[in-house]
A protein has these predicted regions:
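A motif-centric signal for short, conserved binding hotspots located
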Residues: 46
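Active-site-proximal loop/turn and secondary-structure-junction residues that shape catalytic pockets
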Residues: 49, 94, 127
Length: 191
């Protein structure tokens, strides 16, 4: 199954300095509907919370525009048209390991699983950084990540610039995923 890594990073940065981070933090150019049209059925959403406890999308230090609940509602509508459940991987994007972020993430995961669980299958519930399991979703999903930051065959600059590895390896890796690894979710940058 095709999935997109850091699915919301196509969105515009929330802060002006986010524009400087794009070469290092952007992992998708296409919006969620375009990702769906490319065949993606799994979405990797990275969540953090503001001081008021409102969730937002982030990748590293870059916050991106987009309403978390609006995106989940849009995905719910897409599942009704597709007549199939989508998979959503949720990650707490908080490498600083703050306890208040962890508590908010647990509540968020519980709420969205109850509200959207009929339409989407949620999995993972980990915190980026130490990859500790924060929320134990019912569904367990094996994944492969064909992304430069985690790839053994990535060149040094491909580990910090997602587009470079995707440009060089996506075609071959997608063929491998289709031929050999089709029983797992395969996450890609720049589908």
């Amino acid at each position: 199954m095709l999935g997109t890594h850091n699915s919301m990073t196509y969105a515009k940065p929330y802060h002006w300095y986010g524009w400087l981070m794009i070469p290092f933090a952007r992992c998708q150019k296409k919006n969620l509907r375009e990702q769906l049209l490319e065949g993606a059925r799994c979405f990797d959403l990275r969540i953090r919370f503001d001081k008021d406890g409102t969730p937002y999308f982030a990748h590293g230090a870059m916050r991106v525009k987009g309403d978390v609940y609006g995106v989940l509602t849009d995905l719910k509508i897409q599942t009704m048209f597709l007549k199939e459940k989508l998979l959503v991987r949720l990650i707490l994007e908080d490498p600083k390991l703050r306890k208040e972020q962890e508590i908010l993430f647990i509540d968020f995961c519980n709420d969205i699983e109850n509200v959207f669980g009929e339409y989407m299958t949620f999995f993972e519930g980990r915190r980026k950084g130490d990859w500790a399991l924060i929320y134990n979703f019912k569904h367990k999903q094996p994944i492969n990540q064909f992304v430069g930051s985690m790839a053994e065959d990535a060149r040094w600059y491909e580990k910090i610039m997602p587009f470079a590895y995707a440009r060089r390896k996506n075609k071959a890796n997608m063929q491998l995923a289709t031929d050999v690894l089709k029983d797992k979710v395969n996450l890609f940058d720049f589908v």
